């Protein structure tokens, strides 16, 4: 590494530490939703396989969870696998499901989960996932269900429109069965028909890769979320990039439609 590169890295680290201390002075978001975009484009850019790009993306999720805990951000939701992702090749989908399955099994052995009492929850249409993955998800959720310091949500087999449509179907069935008075339905009752209505709405939604859209992610829940778009691909997303997103959020005035 050249002297200029070393100096650049040193300056970046100093700036990161300064920004970290600045961010700690102000209220942080309670809940962040993250659209982890750009694994495949990253892989093509650096000359590795797309599967290796997905592995790098999985490792980045683990890093970001640590960053969230460092800032006492209590809830984070990662958009891990959308319903649209089923359109990819069967080979890629199969690889992703096994990667996710192995990641969950690693969580069961990760002392950070137990030390920090991280509740792990999956949101999505689990019926469309492979049986082996559903079983692993069940074990992880059962193991961590009483942990309440932090919450790690993974949106898998998830689509925002599908979530709302599924909620409407369940509401219709309950109304027809006499379990629900449709005239008493309000936003709070409606949200309890979502995949997990207990999860607070995200304060901030962050997307990597330079794309500026939310791509069917938490459509109901993001009505008043702040949005932040980062130009870097997900595996390259650095702690400095993360701090910049939080700092940007802290400089905004949330109006909630007022």
From Swiss-Prot:
InterPro entries: UPP_synth-like (IPR001441), UPP_synth-like_CS (IPR018520), UPP_synth-like_sf (IPR036424)
Classification via PROSITE patterns: UPP_SYNTHASE
Catalyzed reactions: geranylgeranyl diphosphate + 7 isopentenyl diphosphate = tri-trans,hepta-cis-undecaprenyl diphosphate + 7 diphosphate
Keywords, alphabetical: Magnesium, Metal-binding, Transferase
Cofactor: Mg(2+)
GO biological process, one term: polyprenol biosynthetic process
Lineage top rank: taxon: Archaea
Cofactor: how bound: Binds 2 magnesium ions per subunit.
Binding site for Mg(2+): 37, 226
Active site: 37, 85 (proton acceptor)
EC id: 2.5.1.89
GO molecular function, one term: magnesium ion binding
Pfam families tied to this protein: Prenyltransf
CDD domains found in the cross-reference section: Cis_IPPS
Binding residue positions for substrate: 38-41, 54, 82-84, 86, 88, 207, 213-215
Task of the protein: Catalyzes the sequential condensation of isopentenyl diphosphate (IPP) with geranylgeranyl diphosphate (GGPP) to yield (2Z,6Z,10Z,14Z,18Z,22Z,26Z,30E,34E,38E)-undecaprenyl diphosphate (tritrans,heptacis-UPP). It is probably the precursor of glycosyl carrier lipids.
Family note: Belongs to the UPP synthase family.
Subunit structure: Homodimer.
Record-given protein name: Tritrans,polycis-undecaprenyl-diphosphate synthase (geranylgeranyl-diphosphate specific)
Organism: Thermoplasma acidophilum (strain ATCC 25905 / DSM 1728 / JCM 9062 / NBRC 15155 / AMRC-C165)
């Amino acid at each position: 590494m050249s002297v200029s590169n070393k100096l650049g890295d040193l300056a970046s680290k100093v700036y990161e530490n300064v920004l970290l201390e600045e961010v700690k002075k102000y209220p942080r978001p309670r809940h962040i939703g993250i659209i982890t975009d750009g694994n495949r484009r990253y892989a093509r850019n650096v000359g590795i396989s797309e599967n290796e790009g997905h592995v790098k993306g999985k490792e980045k999720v683990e890093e970001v969870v640590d960053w969230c805990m460092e800032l006492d951000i209590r809830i984070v939701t990662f958009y891990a696998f959308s319903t649209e992702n089923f359109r990819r090749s069967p080979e890629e989908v199969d690889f992703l499901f096994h990667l996710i399955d192995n990641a969950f099994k690693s969580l069961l052995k990760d002392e950070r989960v137990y030390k920090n009492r991280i509740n792990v929850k999956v949101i999505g249409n689990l019926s469309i996932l492979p049986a082996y993955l559903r079983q692993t998800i069940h074990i992880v959720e059962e193991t961590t269900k009483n942990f309440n310091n932090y919450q790690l949500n993974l949106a898998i087999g998830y689509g925002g429109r599908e979530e709302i449509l599924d909620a409407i179907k369940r509401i219709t069935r309950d109304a027809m069965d006499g379990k629900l008075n449709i005239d008493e339905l309000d936003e709070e009752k409606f949200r309890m028909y979502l995949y997990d209505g207990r999860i607070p709405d995200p304060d901030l939604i962050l997307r990597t890769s330079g794309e500026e859209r939310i791509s069917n992610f938490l459509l109901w829940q993001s009505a008043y979320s702040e949005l932040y778009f980062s130009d870097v691909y997900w595996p390259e997303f650095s702690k400095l990039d993360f701090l910049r997103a939080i700092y940007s959020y802290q400089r905004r005035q949330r109006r909630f439609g007022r």
